Amino acid sequence: MTQIIPALDLIDGEVVRLVKGDYKQKKVYKYNPLKKFKEYEKAGAKELHLVDLTGAKDPSKRQLVLIEKLAKEVSVNLQVGGGIRSKEEVKALLDCGVKRVVIGSMAIKDATLCLEILKKFGSEAIVLALDTILKEDYVVAVNAWQEASDKKLMEVLDFYSNKGLKHILCTDISKDGTMQGVNVRLYKLIHEIFPKICIQASGGVASLKDLENLKGICSGVIVGKALLDGVFSVEEGIRCLQNA
């Protein structure tokens, strides 16, 4: 069953949205993050997604106090990402009550450390964020999307799927924050080649039609801007995924 996963991006406790990961293209929403997450939970969301953009820029400023409060106050699963670079950071987040930790660039830059983390904390606790951009082939971008690596997406998935990886969060970064619609072709391709991997789709969700198109392909669809801007509600998203 494909789930809608409402998402909040936080900078210094404020709810924001960036366009294509650019801190200069920042929109601040006057929402209290806890109230917003509780609203999403009440509406029927079973999982919530949080990006700690402050911690992504500076790990020493990770918003752990707020994250712990959010994890304690909501009764559904919370997953957190944002520039996580070490085993200690993963442990700190899990100790806060976070259900899953999202790790990204590390998977490309330090596979040994990434595999150690997968082994230590287990495949249910780790989500690999693979931000991808289409060159001649889909390649993985690193460092908050500022550079494309030479690693092909399918090769990275092949490597980690053989090492016990279960959850991925895949973002087509040409779409993120643009509300231009999702890249269904990309997710279908991953699902066909790696049917046992649970795919969370992210980037560009602009309508209920996007959710419909991803039903049965992805385990979850991360929705940020469309919910914050009132394009559709969590309830409508759930109904759409149940009926599509």
Swiss-Prot record:
Q: What keywords tag this UniProt record?
A: Amino-acid biosynthesis, Cytoplasm, Histidine biosynthesis, Isomerase
Q: Quote the catalytic residue positions.
A: 9, 131
What InterPro entries would the database entry show? Answer: Aldolase_TIM, His_biosynth, HisA_bact_arch, Isoase_HisA-like, Isoase_HisA-like_bact, RibuloseP-bd_barrel
The pathway this protein participates in, as annotated, is: Amino-acid biosynthesis; L-histidine biosynthesis; L-histidine from 5-phospho-alpha-D-ribose 1-diphosphate: step 4/9
Principal EC category: isomerase
**GO CC entries:** cytoplasm
E.C. code: 5.3.1.16
Q: Which reaction does it catalyse?
A: 1-(5-phospho-beta-D-ribosyl)-5-[(5-phospho-beta-D-ribosylamino)methylideneamino]imidazole-4-carboxamide = 5-[(5-phospho-1-deoxy-D-ribulos-1-ylimino)methylamino]-1-(5-phospho-beta-D-ribosyl)imidazole-4-carboxamide
Q: Where in the cell is it found?
A: Cytoplasm
Q: Name one GO biological process term.
A: L-tryptophan biosynthetic process
Check the record and name the Pfam families matching this protein.
Answer: His_biosynth
Q: Which family does it belong to?
A: Belongs to the HisA/HisF family.
Protein name (Swiss-Prot/TrEMBL): 1-(5-phosphoribosyl)-5-[(5-phosphoribosylamino)methylideneamino] imidazole-4-carboxamide isomerase
Organism (species): Campylobacter jejuni subsp. doylei (strain ATCC BAA-1458 / RM4099 / 269.97)
Q: What is the lineage of its organism?
A: Bacteria, Pseudomonadati, Campylobacterota, Epsilonproteobacteria, Campylobacterales
Per UniProt, what is the name of the gene that codes for the protein in this document?
hisA
